[in-house]
Amino acid sequence: MKKKEIKQLKNEIKIALLNSDVETLSHIGKEGHGFLMKSLRKSVWVSLCGLSCRHRMECLSRSTSQSSYADQNQVHLDSERSFFQYKLNPFLLRKHRSQLTKLLSVVFKHYPELCYYQGLHDIAQILLLTLPFSHALPLMEHLVFYRLRDFMLPTLDGTVKQLQLILAVIKARDPTLYEYLIKADIQCYFALSWLITWFAHDVSDISVVCRLFDFFISSHPLTVVYTCAQVVLDNRTSIIELLWDNSGADLLHSYLCKLPASINVNQLIKNTCATISAVPFSSLPLDRYQISPYSCLRNTGDPWEYMSRSNGLLLFRLQLAELQEEKHKPGTKVPAVFLQENIFNGCNMLAAITVIGIGIVASQLIPKSTSNS
């Protein structure tokens, strides 16, 4: 962008903030270059989520001094290996890791029914690198209940169903590419980390990740699913060529996993918006994919209205109750992937799916045995 264009966009954002014009802010988040810088994102992200000063103060008043919580050890381990890709000096590294532990501890101590998953810390660290703690904490809590709650259940149910929706979007937008993927027996596990971390785990350039966060926070939760699908759609030619070369599902899966590293973020957002126009959210068969009526994908209204229209904690509890009822229903067929629950206890379930995803990729790096010795 030219200096004149940057200045004009800054002024447009500042005026929208002064006028509480969230519709204009949402439009900017979906178009062009987003919100540009930390100083603007601090106010814009909070405004787009409908977070009041009172709500922020309530979050900050919560204590972290009470007893331990279910996944405290895992949170500590994830915090200790976080921020490494951003080349911070030792002082800032210690500061941010301490803040990350505190932020996640506040959330999980206050809401013990939530299940931590490995990958949530990737989202949290972007918030802490972009916002002061006073803004990052309430925003994290908001995202947990209005954007990420499907991933915070004690089974893989919500996560797997969202992964399946990625293929549904590809099928609706590009049936030919969809058929190629199905014939190659490609599942959407390659997109697992994209989906549950909002690409923060896969993209090392923080400016690109923040631009994606601008887009996602300005939009409906289904936008993340569509963006995952769009990454695949934008690489259809290379994918089909790999299949024509008989490269095999293993090589293709490995190729797909690495796609986010080279995305053109503004072009990706533009193309995703075009796909949303061509395949509206309302046309996506959520019922066919058994998406819970309490899922965040069922949010109605604009993003800044979610808190006033619904109670995220209540919806999470209803989703949890529905899951437990389904689990104990006679004759219910439990997908094989859910049997991992016998191995991983409740709060570790979504960490388990990350392990499963990593295992799928790792297995492709092991040479297959041959008959020659």
Swiss-Prot record:
Subcellular location: Endoplasmic reticulum membrane
Residue spans crossing the bilayer: 343-363
InterPro entries the record matches: Rab-GAP-TBC_dom, Rab-GAP_TBC_sf, TBC20/Gyp8-like
Cellular component, GO annotation: cytosol; endoplasmic reticulum; endoplasmic reticulum membrane; nucleus
Membrane topology, from the record: Single-pass membrane protein
Keywords tagged on the record: Endoplasmic reticulum, GTPase activation, Membrane, Transmembrane, Transmembrane helix
Domain of life: Eukaryota
UniProt-listed GO biological process terms: endoplasmic reticulum to Golgi vesicle-mediated transport; septum digestion after cytokinesis; vesicle-mediated transport
GO molecular function, one term: GTPase activator activity
Domain (Rab-GAP TBC): residue spans on this chain: 35-220
Task of the protein: Has a role in vesicular trafficking and septation during cytokinesis.
PANTHER family noted in UniProt: RE60063P, TBC1 DOMAIN FAMILY MEMBER 20/GTPASE
Protein name: GTPase-activating protein gyp10
Source organism: Schizosaccharomyces pombe (strain 972 / ATCC 24843) (Fission yeast)
